[in-house]
Swiss-Prot record:
Protein name in the entry: S-adenosyl-L-methionine-dependent tRNA 4-demethylwyosine synthase TYW1B
Cofactors demanded by this protein: [4Fe-4S] cluster
Region (Disordered): 202-269
Pathway assigned to this chain's UniProt record: tRNA modification; wybutosine-tRNA(Phe) biosynthesis
Basic and acidic residues bias locations: 213-223, 233-243
Protein source organism: Homo sapiens
C-alpha cells in the first residue's frame, strides 16, 4: 500500500479553488447584490413596516402591498365588502408626479373618478386613510399625489377613517421638524382611530350645516353606538347630504357646497355667485390660518424661534455620510489647482435651492430659496471647521502610503473649499466669513449653484469663484438640478452674467451626466459667452450609490475618453479657449482662456502668497485697490498639462494602480 495515498495533499483543493475561482467570484457578487437589494427594499418600505407593526400590536391582521403589484381594477372593488381599512402611503416626485411604482394605480384612479360608468358610489363601503410624502419647498405641487389619491377615492364613494396626513421633507417648514416626525404624529392619531373602531366608537358625524366640517361634532368627543347602526347613519348622511364622515382633508379642495353642486344643475348666471362664495371662504380660511400663526411661524419652532439647520434626523443622516470609507486620494498633493491635502472642505450653509440628481447627500440636507434658520457666527464656524479638519487628518496617522511631511502639512489649513454641501452663498454673513479666511491666510474656493445672482454681484473677492453649469437648456436644467425657484432659468442666466463682471478667477463647472446633458454643445457655447469665465472645468459625474431620491445609476457615469471627446468638441465652438490641463484620476479636464497662455506656456495655477498680498492691499484700501486673476497666476507644471503622460500625477509621488482591471459598465 502506498503511504502517500493516505497523506492529505493541500495543493489539490487549492488548485480546485483556482480553477473554479470565477464561480466563487460570481457567488460573492450575487450574494452582495441580493444583500443590497434587500437593504433598498427595507428602506423603501420603512414607513409601511412601522405602521404595520403598530397595527399588529392591536391584534389586527395586516399586509403590506406594493402598488406596483396591485391591480385596482380587480382588487379595489373587493375592499367594499371586506371591512378592511386600506392605508395608502404615496410620495410626490418631480413635477408633482407619482413614483414609478404608483404610476399605474394613480392613472387608473384618476380615470375612474371621472368615468360616468363607475359613478360616485362605486367604492361605497370601502374605508381608507392616505398619508402623502412630499416637500413643501416645491409649493406648487406639494404632496400633490397624496391629495389627488385622497380626492379620487372620495369621489368614488370611499369612506375615510382618518384625515389625510402630509409628510414634509423640508425640515424648516415641516410641522414636526422632519418627515419622520410628521409620520409618527399621524400614525398615533390613526392608531387611536383604529382602537375606536375596534370598540365601536365613532366620531359624531356632521349634520352638513357647518362650514367645511369645522363644527363641534368634528372637534370634540365621540358617542358610543352600535357599529352597524353607526354605519347606516353615515351612509344615510352621505346619500342625502354628500358630506364626508369622520375627519376629512378634501374639504380643502371640495367644500360641502362645492360637492353638492356635483349632484345638481347650476344655471350659468349663478356661477358668478358660486365663485364669489368660494373666494370668500378661501379668504376667511387664510385669515384664520394667519391668526393661528401658521404663516407667521413658518420655519420656527413652537417657541417662535428660528429652527436650527441641523435637526436630529439630519444629524443622523450626516453621521452616516461622514463615516463613509475614505479614499486614498484624500492626501494627494496635486490636483488642477496645486496642493489639495491642505484644503479644508466645509460650508456655512447646508441648505440649497436645488435637489440635483447627482447630489452625494441624497437630499438629506434642508432646501429653500432664502435663509430661514438660526445663524451661527462666522468665527464659530471657522474655529470648529479647522478643529474638525485636524481631527480628520489625525485619523490618517500611521496609515500606509501617507507621507509624514504631508501629514504635518495637512494639519495646517491653507485653503478652504466652500463646496461640501448646500449653497454657501445663502449664508447671510458669507462676506464676513471670507474675510476671516483671508485674515488667517487661508485661500477661498467658493462654489455656487447659479440661482442667486444678487448675492454673486455683492460677493467680496475670493481666490476662485465657481458656478455649477449642470445643463445648457431650461428643460435639461430642470431635469438634472430640480431647482426650487419658479424662475430658475432666468436666475441661472443672471448668475452667469454676474460672473462676467468679477475680476478674480472665475470657473464654470460642468458636470457631465451621460444620456442627459452631453449632447448640448452649441447651447453650452452660448452660455460661455454670457459669463466669459477664466476657466471651464469639465468633469464626469461621480456615482454615489443607489438612492430613492434619484434615478442616477452607474450607467450615467461617462468614461474619461468620452469626457475628453466632449471637451474637444466644445473647444471647437469657443475659439478664445483651449484645453490646458487634465486630471485622469478625477475624470476631469480644464479648459482655459487663452489670456493665461503666455509665451506658449500655460499659467493656470495659483500663486497663493501673491493672492494674500493682493487681498490685504484690497482690504487696507477699503476696496479701492482692486486686482485681477492675472495678478496671482502661476506657471503650470509640465506633468499637469493636457496630453502629458503623467495625466496630472506628480512624478515625485507613487501612483497606485488597481489590480482588478475587470470591465465596468461606466467610467466611474
Amino acid at each position: 500500500m502506498d503511504p502517500s495515498a493516505d497523506t492529505w495533499d493541500l495543493s489539490s483543493p487549492l488548485i480546485s479553488l483556482w480553477i473554479n475561482r470565477f464561480y466563487i467570484y460570481l457567488g460573492f457578487a450575487v450574494s452582495i447584490s441580493l444583500w443590497i437589494c434587500v437593504q433598498i427594499v427595507i428602506e423603501m418600505q420603512g414607513f409601511a413596516t412601522v405602521l404595520a407593526e403598530a397595527v399588529t400590536s392591536l391584534d389586527l391582521p395586516v399586509a403590506i402591498i406594493n402598488l406596483k403589484e396591485y391591480d385596482p381594477d380587480d382588487h379595489l372593488i373587493e375592499e367594499v365588502t371586506s371591512k378592511n381599512v386600506c392605508v395608502f402611503l404615496v410620495a410626490t416626485y418631480t413635477d408633482g408626479l407619482p413614483t414609478e411604482s404608483a404610476e399605474w394605480f394613480c392613472k387608473w384612479l384618476e380615470e375612474a373618478s371621472i368615468d360616468f360608468r363607475f359613478g360616485k358610489t362605486y367604492l361605497k363601503g370601502m374605508r381608507d386613510a392616505v398619508f402623502g410624502l412630499g416637500n413643501s419647498a416645491y409649493a406648487s405641487h406639494f404632496n400633490k399625489v397624496g391629495k389627488n389619491v385622497d380626492k379620487w377615492l372620495w369621489m368614488l364613494g370611499v369612506h375615510r377613517v382618518m384625515s389625510r396626513g402630509e409628510g414634509d421633507c423640508d425640515v424648516v417648514k415641516s410641522k414636526h421638524g422632519s418627515i419622520e416626525a410628521n409620520f409618527r404624529a399621524w400614525k398615533t392619531k390613526f392608531i387611536s382611530q383604529l382602537q375606536a373602531l375596534q370598540k365601536g366608537e365613532r366620531k359624531k358625524s356632521c349634520g352638513g350645516h357647518c362650514k367645511k366640517g369645522k363644527c363641534e361634532s368634528h372637534q370634540h368627543g365621540s358617542e358610543e353606538r352600535e357599529e352597524g347602526s353607526q354605519e347606516q347613519d353615515e351612509l344615510h348622511h352621505r346619500d342625502t347630504k354628500e358630506e364626508e364622515p369622520f375627519e376629512s382633508s378634501s374639504e380643502e379642495e371640495f367644500g360641502g357646497e362645492d360637492h353638492q353642486s356635483l349632484n345638481s344643475i347650476v344655471d350659468v348666471e349663478d356661477l358668478g355667485k358660486i365663485m364669489d362664495h368660494v373666494k370668500k371662504e378661501k379668504r376667511e380660511k387664510e385669515q384664520q390660518e394667519e391668526k393661528s400663526g401658521l404663516f407667521r411661524n413658518m420655519g420656527r419652532n413652537e417657541d417662535g424661534e428660528r429652527r436650527a439647520m441641523i435637526t436630529p434626523a439630519l444629524r443622523e443622516a450626516l453621521t452616516k455620510q461622514v463615516d463613509a470609507p475614505r479614499e486614498r486620494s484624500l492626501l494627494q498633493t496635486h490636483i488642477l489647482w496645486n496642493e489639495s491635502h491642505r484644503c479644508m472642505e466645509t460650508t456655512p450653509s447646508l441648505a440649497c435651492a436645488n435637489k440635483c440628481v447627482f447630489c452625494w447627500w441624497h437630499h438629506n440636507n434642508p432646501v429653500g430659496t432664502e435663509w430661514l434658520w438660526k445663524m451661527d457666527q462666522p468665527e464659530m464656524i471657522l474655529k470648529e471647521a479647522i478643529e474638525n479638519h485636524q481631527n480628520m487628518i489625525k485619523q490618517f496617522k500611521g496609515v500606509p502610503g501617507v507621507k509624514a511631511e504631508r501629514f504635518e502639512e495637512g494639519m495646517t489649513v491653507k485653503h478652504c473649499a466652500l463646496s461640501l454641501v448646500g449653497e454657501p452663498i445663502m449664508y447671510p454673513e458669507i462676506n464676513r466669513f471670507l474675510k476671516l479666511l483671508h485674515q488667517c491666510k487661508i485661500s477661498s474656493f467658493l462654489v455656487t449653484n447659479a440661482q442667486f445672482p444678487a448675492e454673486i454681484r455683492n460677493l467680496e473677492p475670493v481666490t476662485q469663484l465657481y458656478v455649477s453649469v449642470d445643463a445648457s437648456t431650461k428643460d435639461s436644467l430642470k431635469k438634472i438640478d430640480r431647482p426650487l425657484f419658479k424662475d430658475f432659468w432666468q436666475q441661472f442666466l443672471d448668475s452667469l452674467k454676474a460672473l462676467a463682471v468679477k475680476q478674480q478667477r472665475t470657473v464654470y463647472r460642468l458636470m457631465l451626466v451621460k444620456a442627459w446633458n452631453v449632447d448640448e454643445l452649441q447651447a453650452y457655447a452660448q452660455l460661455v459667452s454670457l459669463g466669459n469665465p477664466d476657466f471651464i472645468e469639465v468633469k464626469g459625474v461621480t456615482y454615489c450609490r443607489e438612492s430613492s431620491a434619484s434615478s442616477l445609476t452607474m450607467a450615467h457615469v461617462p468614461w474619461h475618453e468620452e469626457v475628453v471627446q466632449f471637451v474637444r468638441e466644445l473647444v471647437d465652438l469657443i475659439p478664445e479657449y483651449e484645453i490646458a490641463c487634465e486630471h485622469e484620476h478625477s475624470n476631469c479636464l480644464l479648459i482655459a482662456h487663452r489670456k493665461f497662455k503666455i509665451g506658449g506656456e500655460w499659467w493656470t495655477w495659483i500663486d497663493y502668497n501673491r493672492f494674500q498680498e493682493l487681498i490685504q492691499e484690497y482690504e487696507d484700501s477699503g476696496g479701492s485697490k482692486t486686482f485681477s486673476a492675472k495678478d496671482y497666476m502661476a506657471r503650470t507644471p509640465h506633468w499637469a498639462l493636457f496630453g502629458a503622460n503623467e495625466r496630472s500625477f506628480d512624478p515625485k509621488d507613487t501612483r497606485h494602480q488597481r489590480k482588478n482591471k475587470s470591465k465596468a459598465i461606466s467610467g466611474c
